[in-house]
């Protein structure tokens, strides 16, 4: 963990989270983030993903306290100058402070100690039977919102991969996704998903919005 960078270029993306041990594709087209990826590719291939807060009152939105360090594992430049990358989550971090920079992209000083377990290969004691009700409610919610998910493929993944993939792809709000990202471990995250789903229950089954 001592080898991890304490200062990170960051990609603030609303309603988007990435977890350790998950990989996501990203389409980079804004000039400032093209510059950020160029910088990262020439150094350690690492960037930080973090959500801006919902109450945006200016052009430089305030950031949430927790994000995730990601490593660029695949890179391709398109004919029109966009970057298509794949980013693998490594470890979550806590924001310490923003660093002043002349770059157009933002930089943070971060700390990883709170989430050091993200680097460990410890299998948490959960079974698919623990997820059956959550899985059923999530499937109903995804279908209602028009989300297409390959459920058969998910069932073949490990439990942490399944829970994290569903949390990332879910139609939950920015704040709900942030709450899942900040959950200390998989069991807490599973319970948080269950709590969030309970607020959608009437909307799913009775066509009555309770939010």
Protein language model annotation of sequence segments:
Residues 154-172:
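Core structural elements
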Residues 167, 178-181:
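Amphipathic alpha-helical segments within well-ordered protein domains
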